[in-house]
C-alpha cells in the first residue's frame, strides 16, 4: 500500500546504521526520478540527515533524559562525516558529568546555553541510534559523579511552579431512627487544605467545619505553617504550627520555628547504617555483594586492600555474601553478618533537630507554654550510633543520651536513658529517670522477625513534656483522673512474625504490658493474627485481648475474635468481583456475621460493595442490616454514596473529594492531591489516562494532576497512547520529573493536534521531489518528515489549511495545502501538493 512507503527511508537508514562498519554503496539509479538532485553520500556512509531529533539520552546505557536534540554534520580526523549532538554544559552536568573537571568543554560554548565540545573528555563518544531513537553517550566512569541509590542528582531537583493548590472533602449523612422514639439526625463535615507554592516555600493549612444534629456548625483550624528546603544543609526550615519529630523524644505539637535534617535529601547509603565490607584483592578484581539472594553491589577494585562503604542494603537484615572475582579466574568468598540497629546511622552522618516556640495542645484551654528542644544523632565507627537530646519548657526540663549498635547475627540493640525535672499544676516538683532498651532480630533463613522494646522508670517522678504542660489550664479547671496519677514502673512491647511460605501463611504475635508503681496489677494487650491464601482466595484469623486496670484494683478484660474469608468470582463472572464472609465474636455483646460481594467496573473507576450482616444479641428483627456502597473515581474528583437499612435505623450518606491547582495556565481539577504533584500538560489531548491510577485522565484542555510522587527521586509520568484521540499524537509517552518536597512540577508532553495526511509532492515542472527531502509544517516545531521514493510524505498535526517548506541540499520550495472534504483509509487524508 502506498501510504506505507515512507517507511522505506527508515528501513534504509536502519540498515546503513546497523552496518556502518562496512562499506555499502546505494545505487541511486534504483530510485528512479527520486534520485535527481539528492546526495546519497551521507546514506552511503551510514549518516542521517542533520536536524532536530527527539531522542532518549542514554549515559552508559541508562536513560537520563528525553528531549529534542539538534544534530549538526561534522567530520572526524579522517574526514568521515558524523552527526554531532548539541548538548550544553549545563545539560551534561545534569546528566552527571563532572563538567568542572573539564574546562575545555567551554571552548566551543561561550555561554552555558551553547554547544559543548564533548571531545574535551578523553574517550567520550556520542552516537545517534536512529532505530531506537536514542542518543548513546559513552562517558568514562572517572568523568561521572558518583550516583547514589534512592536519590537524583541535586541539579535535577525541581521546586516546581508557583501555584495555589487545595484539597477539599465533604460528607453529609442522614440517619432515621425507628425504634422507641423516632427521630432524624443530620450531620455534615467539610475539610479544606489550601496551600501556596512560591519557589522553594510551601505554605499549608488545614481547616474543617462540622455540624451534628441540632448544633450549629463550627470551624476549626488544625494547622498553618510555611516551610522550605535548605538544600545546602540538607535540612528543612518550618515556621508556624507543626509537630516535632518523634525519634528520640515523643512528638510535641508546637507553634514556632523548627530547623531539622531532611533524610529524603540524602542518599540512603550515606544516612542509613550500612556495613563496611573489607577484603584484599590479589589482582584487578570484581567484587559482588549479595543479600537475601539479590545482588546489591557490584564494583571493580585495584589490587590490594579494599573497603566498600557505600552499600545500599535491600532489607533491614540479612547476611552479606561477598564474592571477589580475580582477574586470573580464581575467586574469594566470605560472609559479613548484618543486622540493622534499632537506631542506626551511616558512619559520619549527622542528623539534628532544633525547635523553639510555644506548646500547642488540641485543647484550647491549655496554657501555651514556651518550649525548646534539640536532638542530635551521629554515626560512629564500629557499627555504633550515638544520640541524645534536651527539652526545656516552663515547669519542665529533660535530657536523654543513648547508644545503638549491631550485634551481627545476634541482632541489633539500642539503649538510652533520660532524666526529667518537672512540676505539674498544683503539685510539688518531681524528678525522675527512665531507661529504654530496643532489640530487633530478623532471621531471613527461617522468615522470623522479632522486636522488643522495654521502658524502665527508675523513679516515681518521671513525666513526659505533654504530661506536665497539659495540666496547666487557664479556665480554672483541673483535669484530674485517678489513671493520670498512676505512675508506671515499666512498660514492655514485643512483636513476633513468622512466615511459613505461600501455603501455610504468616503468623504475627503482638503484646504489651504496663506495670504500675503505686497500685498492684498491670494493663495487658495481646494480639494474634494468621493469614494465608487458598485457591486464589484469602483466609485470616485474628484474636485480641485487652486487660485494663480499674480504680478498685480489678481488671476489665475484653476479647474479640474474628474470622475472614474472601474468594474471587472472576472465573464465573469474567471481571474483578469477590465474595467475602466475616464472623466477629466479642466477649461483651453478640456475635456478628457478615457476607458481602464487591467489585470494580468501568476500568476500575467504579468501586461497589453489597453487604448483609446479622448480630445475634440485637432486638428481634433489628440484627439484620443491609448496606450498599458506591464510589466513582473520576477525572475531576471522587464521588461516593452509601445506604444502610435495618428495622432499627436507616442511614444515607454522600461524600465528595478532589483537588484544585491554580497555575499560570488556568485552573486544573483532579483527584485529591497527595504530597508532591505533577501537573500533566498534553495540550489538545483530552480524556487520556495517565499512569495506572483509576480515573486519572486529562481534562478538556489536556491537563490533569498526579500526586504521591517520590521526592528528590526520578518519577516517570506516562500517558496511555492507545487512548489518544484520533487527531492527536505525542512525540513521547513518558516524562521524567524530580520534585522537591511539596512541589508542583510540570510534566509537559509535546502533542500534535490535527489531521494525518499522505501527500504526493511535485515541483512546478512536474518532476518529483528528491528522495530524502525534509518537509516541515510552518509554525509547527519538531514536525520534520522525509520524502520517500514516490515523492510522498506522511504528515501529522495538520490544520485545515496551511503551508509546508520542503528542503533538499541547497534548494527549497513551499507548498500551500487545504485538506480534502473526506478522509481516506484509516482516517488518513490523501492529497497532492505543488511545491513552488
Give the positions of each predicted feature.
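Post-signal-peptide, soluble extracytosolic/periplasmic N-terminal scaffold domains
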Residues: 2-12, 16-271, 581, 586-661
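Structural motif
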Residues: 43-45, 58-64, 152-157, 276-284, ...
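Short Pro-Gly-centered beta-turn/loop motif in secreted/extracellular proteins
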Residues: 78-87, 311-317, 703-729, 741, ...
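Extracellular beta-sheet/turn segments enriched in Thr/Pro/Gly and aliphatic residues
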Residues: 134-138, 342-345, 670, 733-754, ...
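Feature captures outer-membrane beta-barrel proteins of Gram-negative bacteria and organelles
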Residues: 157, 186-199, 219-233, 368-382, ...
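Sequence/structural signature of outer-membrane beta-barrel proteins
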Residues: 171-179, 208-214, 242-248, 357-363, ...
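Exposed, low-structure sequence patches enriched in small/polar residues
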Residues: 463-465, 487-760, 766-778, 788
